Amino acid sequence: MRIASCSTARTARASNRGELRRSQNWIGGTRPGNAVFVPPPPDHVADLLADLERFIHSPSPELPLLVRIALVHAQFETIHPFLDGNGRIGRLLIAALLENWGLLREPLMYLSGYLKQHQMEYYRQLSIIRTEGNWESWVSFFLEGVASAAAEAERSIIAIASLVAEDRRRLLAAPKAGPASYRLFEMLPMMPRFMVEHARQALDTTFPTASAAVKMLEELSIVAEVTGQKTNRNYSYAAYIELLTR
C-alpha cells in the first residue's frame, strides 16, 4: 500500500523515523481529495494510539484473543501513526501480541506471507471496515490467514526438523567426523552463516580445529563456502536458510 504525501512530508520521512507523524498523510491518489484512504489528522494520532493501548491492556473476556489481535491490527493501520513503515510495524504487532498473550511460546508464525499473497483482498477488507463498518468480514479474513499461516509454519517446522535430522545422521555416519564437527553442527541453527573465526570462538578451540570441523561439514555438503575467496571466507547452511526464508 503506497503512502502518498505532500513534498514536505516526503522530505520529513528520513529525519522523523520512529516519531509520530506531524503532517497529514494519505494512501493512493495525489492529494487527500482523491485518495483511497485518509488517516486521522496528526493532532489526533497520540490520543488514538493511547485508546488503542488501553484496549490492548484491558481485559476483554467476551472477545477471543485472535479476534482482539485482528481488531488491534486494523485499528493500528487505520490510525497510520507514522509517515512510513506502518505496514511493517502493524505486522510485527500481530506477532508480538500472539507471543505476549500466550498463543505462541515462540514467534514461529507470521502472517506477513499470507497478507502479501492476498494483498489486494487485505486492502479491500481494511477498506470496507472504514467505509461500511464491516468488521465481521475483516475478522473472518484475518482468522483464515492465521489458519493458513499456522499450517505453513507447521510444514516448515517439519521440513526443518527433517533436514537437520538427516544431516545429523550423515555426519554421525562419517568416519572422519570428530567432536568439534558434531558440536559445530549443533550450533548451525543459531549461526547458519559464519566464518571460521566465528566457529573457533563458538567452539572455544584453536583455529586449526575449527577449520577442520568446518571442512568436515563442507565435505558432507552440509555447509558451503559462498564468497569464492581464499581469505575471509564465509560459509552457509544454505538448505536450512532456504527453508527459513521460503
What positions do the PLM features span?
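FIC/Doc superfamily catalytic core
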Residues: 1-246
